[in-house]
């Protein structure tokens, strides 16, 4: 169980939208030693291998989404992880198919994050 504020179980899902087709989603699970998902990224779990992603970042053509929560008990932390998993399944189902036709990758070191995005 947590003994200080640094030991809080935190689930964080951040979203930023540079334009209407591009969404940067990163999921970080801190201190999730007791999490059923362990070191896996809830957002990327079950995702197709050809979905554009870097580490724990996933690129989706959604509008906006923000989910942040923290808990100092294991039961609440587990509930937050379940909510994150549900969000990720919804995102995967409704957004992943669209992105495959929206993003192309650059051949050089140009700014690939905005490459090939059509508005």
From Swiss-Prot:
Residue spans crossing the bilayer: 74-91
Subcellular location: Membrane
One annotated Gene Ontology cellular component of this protein: membrane
Membrane topology: Single-pass membrane protein
Keywords of this entry: Membrane, Transmembrane, Transmembrane helix
Keyword Transmembrane helix: yes
Protein's UniProt keywords contain Transmembrane helix: yes
Protein name per UniProt: Putative uncharacterized protein C576.19c
Organism per entry: Schizosaccharomyces pombe (strain 972 / ATCC 24843) (Fission yeast)
